[in-house]
């Protein structure tokens, strides 16, 4: 059996933009040729694409770092550097992508072929041909390429199924799935034979079809990690109907009604929303003599928990082994699915603010000023730091341009207001310079 992996932590880094070029046209009979340096190419983005052929996140077990290529540098004759190709990362249907730092959901990938840009490549730096003006017709200025976005991500796979089978171990969930679909789950006369989710397609005699998922068995205390815990319950979150399978023969010595209550308590503890899904009670192993009396007692206890005007959950007596009662169960399940809408998986508060996350929202401050213990003024801020890394500090004209940009942003004035004096050290990242008043 292939290994099943439904969670992974990875890092992605988009490619840096290529640096712009400083070059001048030098040709015979072309005096004062002027600037001729081209722009750098765009860095490659990291894109997630859904592949319906994938079933687990196993590909991410050993490959956890994904880095797109950088754009090429600008060239002479005003030619642009070649942009880097985007890095396509394939994920299975049902993959939720979260920001590892905040836990917020970035995207939920459920459609085959669906694509999402997870990390955007940096834009190419401008060459000196872009900075020519009447006052400075031969500028020795070019920008460095913009760094690509870098993110730490958590991937979580929740398989796509319409119907989920839940219940204690060895109540017959896997047998039921194997009988009503072409799935071949492992079946055995011991607990936790099923240790990974299994998926099968079910077709009723009336022509309806739906996907059914068999989950590893739960036991009391699963929400505290007993048994296999609730690690696989995430796979039931996309389902619209739950089939609660109960061993009505009580062959394990447990009371069927207590089983029913215990499993529902575990579902509620794991995720309160799971109890919003309609349940059908599947009274299995009815071919065993004791099951009939147990079913009567079960119905009596169940009815005692409801008011006389409440609708009781539907109960279908079946025997997966003897193929009894299956047709009625499947038809009722299909009818319930037809009138049950999909459930909202995430609240608005669970999602990232897309404008802020992808840098579209305007920040309140372009920069911040702090002071270190050694009396150095420290400048920080996303916009300011982006300007800094795109400045070629090896060319005087580029440094002067950066100084003008800082002045235009109000950095000089803000430093004066904070008490900065002429000659005070100022630091941006690892670059240090003196404040000139």
From Swiss-Prot:
Q: Tell me which residues make up the Obg domain.
A: 2-160
**Which GO cellular component terms are attached?**
cytoplasm
The OBG-type G domain sits at 161-338
UniProt-listed InterPro entries: G_OBG, GTP-bd, GTP-bd_Obg/CgtA, GTP-bd_prot_GTP1/OBG_C_sf, GTP1-OBG_CS, GTP1_OBG_dom, GTP1_OBG_dom_sf, OBG_GTPase
Please give the CDD domains that the UniProt record associates with this protein.
Obg
Swiss-Prot/TrEMBL keywords: Cytoplasm, GTP-binding, Hydrolase, Magnesium, Metal-binding, Nucleotide-binding
Q: Which GO terms describe its biological process?
A: ribosome biogenesis
Give this protein's Gene Ontology molecular function annotations.
Answer: GTP binding; GTPase activity; magnesium ion binding
SUPFAM superfamilies referenced in this protein's UniProt entry, alphabetically: Obg GTP-binding protein C-terminal domain (SSF102741), Obg GTP-binding protein N-terminal domain (SSF82051), P-loop containing nucleoside triphosphate hydrolases (SSF52540)
This protein's record includes keyword Magnesium: yes
Indicate which residues the UniProt annotation says bind Mg(2+).
174, 194
Which residue numbers delimit the OCT domain? 359-437
Cofactor(s) this protein cannot do without: Mg(2+)
Main location, first listed in the record: cytoplasm
| Pfam families, per database record | DUF1967, GTP1_OBG, MMR_HSR1
* EC numbers for this chain: 3.6.5.-
Q: What class of enzyme is it?
A: hydrolase
Where is this protein found? Cytoplasm
Work out whether the entry's keyword set contains Thylakoid: no
Lineage: superkingdom: Bacteria
Provide the binding site for GTP.
Answer: 167-174, 192-196, 214-217, 284-287, 319-321
Q: How does it assemble?
A: Monomer.
Enumerate the HAMAP family for this protein.
GTPase_Obg
Q: What does the protein in this record do?
A: An essential GTPase which binds GTP, GDP and possibly (p)ppGpp with moderate affinity, with high nucleotide exchange rates and a fairly low GTP hydrolysis rate. Plays a role in control of the cell cycle, stress response, ribosome biogenesis and in those bacteria that undergo differentiation, in morphogenesis control.
UniProt lists the family membership as follows:
Belongs to the TRAFAC class OBG-HflX-like GTPase superfamily. OBG GTPase family.
> Can you name this protein?
GTPase Obg
Gene (UniProt): obg
């Amino acid at each position: 059996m292939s290994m099943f992996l439904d969670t992974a932590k990875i890092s992605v880094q988009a490619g840096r933009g290529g640096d712009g070029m400083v070059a001048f046209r030098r040709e015979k009979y072309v005096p004062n040729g002027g600037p001729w340096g081209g722009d750098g190419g765009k860095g490659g983005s990291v894109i997630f694409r859904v592949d319906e052929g994938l079933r687990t996140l196993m590909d991410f077990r050993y490959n956890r770092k994904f880095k797109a290529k950088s754009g090429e540098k600008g060239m002479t004759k005003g030619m642009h550097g070649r942009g880097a190709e985007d890095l396509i990362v394939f994920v299975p249907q049902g993959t939720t992508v979260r920001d590892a730092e905040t836990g917020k959901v970035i995207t939920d990938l459920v459609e085959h072929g669906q694509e999402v840009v997870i990390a955007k490549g940096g834009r190419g730096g401008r060459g000196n041909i872009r900075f020519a003006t009447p006052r400075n017709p031969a500028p020795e200025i070019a920008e460095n390429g913009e760094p690509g976005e870098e993110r730490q991500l958590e991937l979580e796979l929740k398989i796509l199924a319409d119907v989920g089978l839940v219940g204690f171990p060895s109540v017959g969930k896997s047998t039921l799935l194997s009988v009503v679909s072409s799935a071949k789950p492992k079946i055995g006369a011991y607990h936790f034979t099923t240790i990974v989710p299994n998926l099968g397609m079910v077709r009723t005699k009336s022509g309806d079809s739906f996907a059914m998922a068999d989950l590893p068995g739960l036991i009391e205390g699963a929400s505290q990690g007993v048994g296999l815990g609730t690690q696989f319950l995430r796979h039931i979150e996309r389902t619209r109907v739950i089939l609660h399978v109960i061993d009505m023969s009580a062959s394990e010595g447990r009371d069927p009604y207590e089983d029913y209550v215990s499993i529902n308590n575990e579902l509620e503890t794991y995720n309160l929303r799971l109890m919003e899904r309609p349940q059908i009670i599947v009274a299995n192993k009815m071919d065993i003599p004791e099951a009939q009396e147990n079913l009567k007692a079960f119905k009596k206890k169940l009815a005692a928990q409801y008011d006389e005007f409440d609708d009781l959950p539907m109960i279908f007596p079946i025997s997966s082994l003897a193929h009894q009662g299956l047709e009625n169960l499947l038809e009722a399940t299909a009818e319930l699915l037809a009138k049950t809408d999909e459930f909202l998986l995430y609240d608005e508060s669970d999602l990232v603010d897309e404008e802020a996350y992808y840098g579209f929202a305007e920040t309140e401050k372009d920069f911040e000023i702090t002071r270190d213990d050694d009396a150095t003024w420290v400048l920080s801020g996303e916009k300011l730091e982006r300007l800094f890394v795109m400045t070629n500090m090896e060319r005087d004209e580029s440094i002067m341009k950066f100084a003008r940009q800082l002045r235009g942003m109000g950095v000089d004035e803000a430093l004066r207001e904070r008490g900065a004096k002429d000659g005070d050290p100022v630091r941006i990242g690892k670059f240090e310079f003196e404040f000139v008043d």
